Amino acid sequence: MVCGGFACSKNALCALNVVYMLVSLLLIGVAAWGKGLGLVSSIHIIGGVIAVGVFLLLIAVAGLVGAVNHHQVLLFFYMIILGLVFIFQFVISCSCLAINRSKQTDVINASWWVMSNKTRDELERSFDCCGLFNLTTLYQQDYDFCTAICKSQSPTCQMCGEKFLKHSDEALKILGGVGLFFSFTEILGVWLAMRFRNQKDPRANPSAFL
């Protein structure tokens, strides 16, 4: 078997979609696990992660079925959808890597003041910090109502904004890097699907069109 032939392209496309299926199931499983253990309280975050996992699973199943059956229509739509996902994911990944510390601070500030008091309290206890940044008139109010453990162990607690910035910077780099990696695997998937779709099945009727 020559690599680049019908069987090789089929096996490579099947393997790539199996990887996508495993990643999607992992996303769904991690979201359910995080909700079950109470690590993430926001139903919107859980729902978003599960939705992404289900969407990726559907794409992977369509690609796998199209590859196994050499289904022209499925492979065509698989290429189109995967190409659109690549563009979207590439832009988002580059944006994650391009966000500077000043922009992160603005986003954290804006998010903090639209949160409910319950959510703020959960974050303060989770990160063991009090208040956001000591640059606002409401910081002292946040600090007074803070219930984090650090408040009873030391005279002052670290500001949550500093911890959020540290974690957000790490998270954005990881998300951007992983997103770029998967975006290039999606381009590989589009190329494999296009190549495989235009190859003739050696087991098919020689007079049939592809």
UniProtKB/Swiss-Prot annotation:
Residues 34-44, 94-173 are extracellular. Its main location: membrane. It is found in: Membrane. It is a multi-pass membrane protein. One of its GO terms (cellular component) is plasma membrane. Residues 1-12, 66-72, 195-210 are cytoplasmic. Keywords: Glycoprotein, Membrane, Transmembrane, Transmembrane helix. GO terms for biological process: positive regulation of cell population proliferation. Coiled coil: none annotated. Glycans are attached at N100, N109, N117, N134. The chain crosses the membrane at residues 13-33, 45-65, 73-93, 174-194. Belongs to the tetraspanin (TM4SF) family. This is Tetraspanin-31. It comes from Homo sapiens (Human).
